[in-house]
Amino acid sequence: MHDGRVKTQALRVLARSLPPLYDSTVDRHGCKVFTVRRYNRRVIDFAGIRNKTLEIIKTDRNLPLNTECNVKVVDSACMRCRKSFAVYPAVTYLHCGHSCLCTDCDETVNVDNTCPKCKSGIRYKLKYKTL
């Protein structure tokens, strides 16, 4: 029983010492951007990670709880520059859930906050900072 309490206390201390999972900013075009601090290029279940990250952001109340986040399958490459998403992180647009531009192209091309794939309006973006 004592070991369980010590383990729980150690986990709490560790959780407090870790940096936050993401940063929240507003880009120059007025879109709220969540930039996830940890990004592993070898991750296979990218959609699963995006879904879990979005749930954490909702739990933290940085994203409205009623926000629909239907994350779509990620394309294999950026639709503009053709960089492989196996090497470069994609930006996920919400509410549509598409991930079709790399971070670089999103910052230079997507000035009107519309998804390049489905043309729907974007209010939130989920980005990943590379290690």
Curated annotation (Swiss-Prot):
InterPro entries for this protein: Znf_RING, Znf_RING/FYVE/PHD
UniProt keywords, alphabetically: Metal-binding, Zinc, Zinc-finger
An annotated Gene Ontology molecular function: zinc ion binding
Gene3D superfamilies: Zinc/RING finger domain, C3HC4 (zinc finger)
Zinc finger (RING-type): 78-119
Superkingdom: Viruses
Protein name: Uncharacterized 15.0 kDa protein in GTA-P79 intergenic region
